[in-house]
Regions:
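Glycine-centered secondary-structure boundary/capping sites
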Residues: 5, 41, 69, 179-186
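Catalytic cores of histone-lysine modification enzymes
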Residues: 32, 36-137
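Generic secondary-structure boundary/loop-capping signal
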Residues: 3-5, 15-16, 117-118, 124, ...
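Conserved AWS/pre-SET-to-SET junction and N-terminal core of the SET lysine methyltransferase domain
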Residues: 1-51, 125-151
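Compositionally biased, low-complexity repeat tracts
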Residues: 9-13, 23, 91, 115, ...
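Intrinsic disorder
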Residues: 14, 18, 24, 114-117, ...
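C-terminal SET catalytic tail plus cysteine-rich post-SET Zn-binding segment of SAM-dependent SET-domain
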Residues: 125, 129-214
Length: 214
């Protein structure tokens, strides 16, 4: 039985997060899991999409959620649900539970296919963002399995963080922060890194090829 080298912990000022329970080496796989819920909504379409364009996708997401067993629904609803004055403004037909689900999905989803499908994961969706990450993630399209791998050494007790927008290019730090704040509904407090450690890791590990060799 493999014991994960990470655990969910309370993080001051962030709520929950993932912390190393032992020292982690660069390139080490720390987590692999399947999603609780998959939808065709991304953070951007959830908040800024036209009502007619996103209404069907929202209904499908709610239906998929309703088809989960109660234990899975409870895990989904336990994820962070940010308060937002514009939450679900394009979907007044939704009840409070559905609006909460939409906020959870917008804030916690992880991309599976490039701008096609996103998933909520029991553990990985609690990993916090950093513009200077020490890990990266990648979901495999064929089975939606997600792998999280370190891109530098991580000390015991240190938080494992990823860059939610590692593949996006932003001309300025302000544009990057605006996108994060608008889509993920939290204030990014990190500065633009001078060296993208995870981009280096992707090159070293053959464009995530090692994710599927464990």
């Amino acid at each position: 039985m493999n014991i994960r080298p990470v655990a969910i912990r309370d993080i001051k000022g962030k709520g929950k997060g993932l912390v190393a329970t032992r020292s982690l080496k660069e390139g080490e796989v720390v987590l692999q899991e399947l999603p609780l819920l998959v939808g065709q909504l991304t953070s951007s379409t959830t908040w800024t999409g036209a009502p007619q364009a996103t209404s069907l996708l929202v209904k499908k997401l709610v239906q998929t959620f309703n088809n989960l067993v109660p234990e899975q629904q409870a895990l989904v609803l336990s994820l962070h649900a940010p308060e937002h004055s514009e939450s679900c403004v394009n979907h007044p037909e939704l009840g409070e539970k559905e609006k909460r689900l939409l906020r959870i999905f917008a804030s916690n989803n992880i991309e599976i296919d490039h701008h096609e499908r996103c998933g909520l994961y029991e553990v990985a969706s609690r990993i916090n963002h950093s513009c200077s990450p020490n890990a990266y993630w990648q979901a495999r399209s064929k089975d939606t399995k997600l792998t999280v791998r370190t891109c530098q050494d991580v000390a015991v007790g240190e938080e494992v963080v990823v860059d939610y927008y590692i593949f996006d290019n932003f001309p300025t730090r302000e544009e990057r922060m605006t996108k994060i704040n608008n889509e993920r509904l939290f204030m990014c407090r990190y500065t633009m890194p001078t060296e993208r450690l995870c981009i280096k890791a992707i090159v070293c590990y053959g464009d995530f090829s090692l994710c599927w060799q464990v």
